[in-house]
Amino acid sequence: KAEEEHYSISQTFEETASNEYEHAEVWFKLLNDGELPSVMDSLKEAVSGEHYEHTYMYDEFADIAAEEGYEDIAEKFRRVGEVEKTHEKRYMDLLELLIDEKLYKSENNTIWISQKCGNINVGKTPPDKCQICEHENTYFARK
């Protein structure tokens, strides 16, 4: 909102959000023997969380909103639940690629986009190193 209202304080909000993220990481590590979970464990947890959100949480929110006469809000909760379903699928797909060791391999030509600079490559694998920003291939994602 600060940026929209042309105040030059939006950077303060962004910096504070980044600080809060780091604080959360500290607490998470303290609760998990100083470690962050593996990517595979994080994906499994994300799948579980998204599944809960789209099968229970947002439906319950929608039911309560409708009971209280807020049908427009209930409809938004239902729609957000549908978005959460796509999040679950996205995480499940990534988990499957990781398990099958195909995160950076494809049987067909695939569009690979650098998540750092936007460079686009087509092939069965991303390049070993980005031709623009020179980040390694793990910074590429399928389109």
PLM regions and their residue ranges:
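Non-heme di-metal
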Residues: 1-143
